[in-house]
Amino acid sequence: RQMCIRDRYKRGIVLAVLIPLITGIVTAGILAVCYYINIVLGCVVETIMCYQILAVKSLKTESMKVYYALKNEGVPQARQAVSMIVGRDTSQLDEHGITRAAVETVAENTSDGVVAPLFYMMFFGAVGGFVYKAVNTMDSMIGYKNDKYLHFGRFAAKMDDVVNLIPCLLYTSDAADE
């Protein structure tokens, strides 16, 4: 049992290191070829890549569906709408619970989908943005504290915590100043 746990943890480390590494290499390779062909082509491709990294519109659209459902259609429809953006059971949520779930999701996804990617793109361009998204996506997929992923996804979850630390501090500090 102990060996199995250790083996899962080691395999999780390998995955958590390889995925962002491969993502960075592929992204840098594509950009290097584009910039080699023509600097304008490189700039256009990198701009498109950076745009694709940011998750602004879908977050707004889905959260507004929750708002309109609460306002116009009632709690059952709002539960359905909020279930599309949260990873928890929404079947027993009241109006307050639905609102809280939506606000928490918007706040977290603003950090994960906008603030942190912008932070990494500011310093490392599209490569930094894609590497960040690879780490963040791994956490979303295997960073759970359940029997299946507890040991395998632990390193990916910690890695996500580390890469989000500075952007999150900047985001919360700026929000507190408002």
Say what each PLM segment does.
Residues 147-169, 173:
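Divalent-cation-assisted or electrostatically stabilized phosphate/pyrophosphate-binding catalytic cores
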Residues 1-2, 6-33:
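N-terminal transmembrane signal-anchor/hairpin module of polytopic inner-membrane proteins
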Residues 58-111, 115-126, 137-147, 154, ...:
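Polar-ligand-bearing catalytic/cofactor-coordination segments
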Residues 27, 31-35, 51, 67, ...:
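Membrane-water interface at transmembrane helix exits
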Residues 3-7, 171-178:
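Conserved small/polar residues in nucleotide/adenosyl-binding loops
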Residues 41-67:
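Hydrophobic alpha-helical membrane-embedded segments
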